[in-house]
């Protein structure tokens, strides 16, 4: 069936781009800062400023990934994957700008990062999120992530740790 045509119809182009090199590296850095401001948490305990200054850092291929989601060429969101010990990867800095939410971009970015993790041979992927981030938690649960005990020390209240296997586990 052909896509609808007519007045008011606009085809939206969504692209996931590798942001491990300029010029998208600066876009990713800006999105990371926006993410940090939006969650309203000081991430100094994670070495956030050092992370920004050294991008792509741990998110560089082949062990990591740094993606920017573009909608009609406009930066709409981001996400990253980095290696942890023991054949485990970690999703970080998952963020979709409010104006672009509800289009499945977060899922698209997360799926691409999970695919990269599987291709890299990671046995599992972990993440941490905050209790108030209900939409993010629901997304992760729908993708097969389950709550686990803390895998690192985080001084923030209400941190939820999650993990998902990379093999062919049910989502």
What is the role of each PLM region?
Residues 2, 8, 158-171:
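Terminal substrate-recognition subdomain of acyl/acetyltransferases
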Residues 15-92, 97-98, 110-112, 116, ...:
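Acetyl-CoA-dependent GNAT
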Residues 98-101, 126-136, 153-158:
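Conserved beta-strand-loop-alpha-helix junction that forms the acyl-donor binding cleft
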Residues 103, 107, 111:
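Residues forming the Rossmann-fold NAD(P)(H) cofactor-binding site
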Residues 110, 117-129:
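Conserved GNAT acetyl-CoA-binding A-motif
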Residues 140, 145:
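Conserved active-site tyrosine of GNAT-family acetyltransferases
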């Amino acid at each position: 069936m052909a896509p609808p045509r007519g007045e008011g119809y606009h085809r939206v182009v969504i692209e996931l781009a590798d942001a491990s090199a300029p010029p998208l590296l600066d876009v990713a850095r800006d999105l990371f800062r926006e993410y940090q401001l939006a969650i309203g948490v000081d991430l100094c305990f994670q070495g956030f400023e050092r992370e920004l200054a050294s991008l792509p850092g741990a998110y560089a291929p082949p062990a990591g990934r740094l993606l920017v989601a573009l909608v009609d060429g406009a930066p709409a969101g981001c996400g990253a994957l980095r290696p942890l010990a023991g054949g485990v990867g970690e999703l970080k800095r998952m963020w979709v700008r409010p104006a672009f939410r509800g289009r499945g971009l977060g899922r698209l970015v997360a799926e691409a990062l999970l695919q990269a993790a599987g291709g890299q041979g990671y046995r599992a992927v972990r993440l941490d999120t905050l209790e108030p981030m209900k939409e993010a938690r629901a997304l992760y649960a729908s993708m097969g992530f389950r709550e686990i005990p803390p895998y690192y020390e985080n001084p923030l209240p209400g941190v939820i740790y999650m993990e998902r296997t990379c093999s062919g586990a049910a989502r």
